[in-house]
């Protein structure tokens, strides 16, 4: 058994990939599923859609690879983080749609907690800030708004889990209720210093401990699938949240290594080693991975809108038919125009953390057209990455002693235009790897490590291969002018916040 099956459950689709022992890809399957937007700022998924699409893609990938369950050494799971599911322990029936990480409905709960002065203590325990992004307030909302849910939870009848936990519970036929440290660290309920669920936080958010899963290493024995799913049992041996899995897939095992993933949003992680680094620039302190009971930490910056801004160009404005058209269109833009898009469609993430502001375009003229809008959209992702980059360099103690090279992955990195502009604005090299499926690869590696298919991290890192290095080519004067314009645009958006 030299094959590993990776489940990559994302915000808009579920994917399954079969990896060989040399980390080459044997098969890929993908299935999209709908998102639901019942109110402004609300984003939901049907848990059954998540489950069904996951099982179907796994079966499809196995069929494409010509493999059976007996050929698979282990399954690794990576998932959209923070997305929250609450279900009945006895029936497996979800009591509410999954509340997605992008969802902002708990902004008022968060504002109240902040006003009561809880954020410093919460941040010290979790490494996070109080924000609707994280799972804790989503759980509280479900318990308070679904009739009878709180009473059922207090009687021990309901379970909570992030998507990995929910899938594991279903895959194992309800026998295993567990997660890993990376996903637990995104809930606002987990103490990243003790590695335990925190009773003070549970009391603050009124979440019964009986709802919570067991927390394990990222590479561990998570049980086996029921035989009926794939024609035989397969052990589940690795779990990590999508951004941590990408960090592993990018082989960022050394402190000071940084990766940025461009999907629906953009997420940058900087490995800080065995010591959690407290940010002075509104970054998050999180767990990068946990192996053999040892936690490795990271600084993280989260941008809510990246690839979804390109989807807006396609679906909202209709100026492109396919995402791949965006770069060539942007290349035709008028260089004399300075158009800035601040894509705060669901608020702003790091380092601003304002859930109330909304997006805006600046610098429009009568001559502004589709090319300029495409240019501004792609550039907005680069500017937001610059904000994270600058904050990480300020927070990381060794930044002055070493140049951080950024490793990138995700759908948007296929755009040479965007990656070159990113290198220009960062004034630093940007490395795109040969294997772009780094998130799935990270999940596969964790499972394969436990199953004996893959070697220890240091040796695994030797397999990382560079596809292209983008080097900065923009003049310092142009760079500073463009960054100053971006700063003014963000300031304008933040000034529009009336605190309502």
UniProtKB/Swiss-Prot annotation:
UniProt xrefs under Gene3D superfamilies: 3.30.420.40
What the entry lists under InterPro entries is as follows:
ATPase_NBD, Carb_kinase_FGGY, Carb_kinase_FGGY_CS, FGGY_C, FGGY_N, Glycerol_kin
CDD domains recorded for this chain? Answer: FGGY_EcGK_like
Query: Does this UniProt record's set of keywords contain Manganese?
Result: no
Q: Where does ATP bind?
A: 11-13, 264, 307, 311, 411
Q: In which pathway does it act?
A: Polyol metabolism; glycerol degradation via glycerol kinase pathway; sn-glycerol 3-phosphate from glycerol: step 1/1
**Residue numbers binding sn-glycerol 3-phosphate:** 11, 81-82, 133, 242
- The residues that the entry says bind ADP are 11, 15, 264, 307, 411
Which GO biological process categories is it annotated with?
glycerol catabolic process; glycerol metabolic process; glycerol-3-phosphate metabolic process
- Which UniProt keywords are present, listed alphabetically? ATP-binding, Glycerol metabolism, Kinase, Nucleotide-binding, Transferase
Q: EC number(s) per UniProt? A: 2.7.1.30
- First-level EC class: transferase
Which residues are involved in binding glycerol? 81-82, 133, 242-243
A UniProt-annotated Pfam family: FGGY_C
Q: Name one GO cellular component term.
A: cytosol
The record's GO molecular-function terms, alphabetically, read: ATP binding; glycerol kinase activity
Catalyzed chemical reaction(s): glycerol + ATP = sn-glycerol 3-phosphate + ADP + H(+)
Q: Which PROSITE patterns match?
A: FGGY_KINASES_1, FGGY_KINASES_2
Activity control mechanisms: Inhibited by fructose 1,6-bisphosphate (FBP).
Q: Which family does it belong to?
A: Belongs to the FGGY kinase family.
Q: Which NCBIfam families match?
A: glycerol_kin, PRK00047.1
This chain's function reads: Key enzyme in the regulation of glycerol uptake and metabolism. Catalyzes the phosphorylation of glycerol to yield sn-glycerol 3-phosphate.
* Protein name stated in the entry: Glycerol kinase
Source organism (scientific name) = Bradyrhizobium sp. (strain ORS 278)
Q: Which gene encodes it?
A: glpK
